[in-house]
Amino acid sequence: MSHLVSIIIPCYNNADTIQEALDSVYNQTYKEFEVIVVNDGSQDQSAEKIREYQESYAELIFLNQDNRGPSAARNYGASIAKGHYIIFLDGDDRLHEEYISTCIDHFESDATLDLVYSVTELFENESGVFFLAEYDPKTILIQNCFPITAMIRRKDFFANGQFDEKLRIAEDWEMWIRHTREFPNVKKIDRKLFFYRKRVTKDSISDLNKVNNTIDDAHLYIYNKHYQLYREAGWHIIDLLSSRREYLKYKKKYYDQWFKKVFRWVKGVK
């Protein structure tokens, strides 16, 4: 039995890459899918590029919203999705042509699965495999274990509460923390079927952190939101700090900013 798959693509200033992302979807060997692109208030030529693509693929669903961040854009797309399964793909990344068919094969061969994903390969400014820790309920509390493109059931996504729209970064990690608590059976495909673009831009994580401590605020928010889970797992805020510090390779001055912020926050917790 063929199941419809909804591919939801948030797009913010991706004029130079959105058609490449769409090509990777429309070149899939599995053809039972719908594509929903949500323009999140782009200020470049993204909207024009998407409309141009619609000239060849009239069935492409194109939505516009004011800039509210990737969480809100994905939730908006999901709200009109009709697929049995959903995949979120960012507007500057790509899927291997067999990504959907391979995920579907695993779901159909094992009805107990809740989430299927593949090895991630970097491209553009970096190459090689993008490291993600193997999932277990404790590890995911200190680092993300899944790419945004993991395939899940649409009904499970809504049962889980969707993306937290208060987050504009690390929103996928926070969502996976919640999702895997309710739907813990995951399958990793040992093939490079998702391509994650690494770019050198002013939007990079380190630059965001310089401007307004975006990462720090997100991690503190996640720790506070899931405080009981961290306590039950035996993780403390310093464990989260150490893990992210190593993973992101911040410079020392940013470690110091983070630690001072954490210290002030912890002092306020009674």
Label the model's feature ranges:
Residues M1-N213:
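Nucleotide-sugar donor-binding/catalytic module of glycosyltransferases
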Residues E174, R181-K188, K192-K270:
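C-terminal subregions of glycosyltransferases and related glycan-biosynthesis enzymes
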